[in-house]
């Protein structure tokens, strides 16, 4: 019958060296309970690429955009902050796994897939500076064609980038209030 899925011949491939690096960086920086998603293939590719940059270089990825504000991905974002000089993220949105007004705001997906999409360009300089996170949300209610037209005419210089000041938890967007940590825990077993 042949191969029915791309994973048929690749199920559970092990990458011991790469997974060790992910454990030392993304996982070590994460406070999430379940860290399995940090071993996702696109995060593996980014970890591999950062390590291959050496002292300096540039990398670009088009990926799922869930890492931008996902709780589990805070360790990944903290690693980007620690290891890179500039990170440019163009959030193309398009997450159709939402409902109501949020689904209307996300609207068109540039690849006609269910998850949102982002373009990330990262720069690593030989002499490290504090990282600068450049973020742009492409906008609300845009069709896939409108988003692609914006991408087509965009350059690093003409995009109105928002400079993100990450907090100590690795939050870039929707940052939590730091006073929250001083509040007493609720429920049994909650100890700070």
Predicted feature descriptions by range:
Residues 41-45:
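Alpha-helical packing segments of well-folded alpha/beta enzyme cores
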Residues 9, 17, 29-32, 48-192:
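Sequence-level detector for compositionally biased, low-complexity segments
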Residues 2-38:
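Mobile active-site "lid"/loop adjacent to the S-adenosyl-L-methionine
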């Amino acid at each position: 019958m042949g191969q029915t899925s791309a994973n048929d011949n690749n199920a559970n491939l092990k990458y011991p060296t790469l997974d060790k690096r992910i454990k030392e960086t993304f996982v070590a920086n994460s406070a999430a309970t379940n860290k399995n998603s940090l071993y996702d293939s696109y995060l593996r590719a980014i970890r591999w690429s950062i390590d291959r940059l050496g002292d300096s270089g540039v990398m670009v990825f088009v990926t799922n955009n869930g890492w931008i504000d996902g709780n589990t991905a805070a360790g990944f974002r903290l690693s980007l902050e620690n290891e890179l000089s500039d990170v440019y993220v163009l959030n193309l949105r398009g997450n159709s796994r939402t409902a109501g007004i949020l689904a209307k705001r996300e609207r068109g997906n540039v690849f006609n897939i269910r998850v949102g999409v982002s373009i990330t360009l990262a720069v690593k300089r030989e002499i490290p500076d504090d990282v600068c996170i450049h973020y742009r949300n492409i906008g609300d209610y845009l069709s896939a064609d409108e988003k692609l037209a914006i991408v087509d005419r965009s350059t690093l210089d003409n995009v109105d980038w928002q400079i993100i000041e990450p907090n100590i938890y690795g939050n870039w967007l929707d940052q939590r209030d730091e006073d929250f940590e001083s509040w007493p825990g609720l429920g049994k077993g909650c100890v700070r």
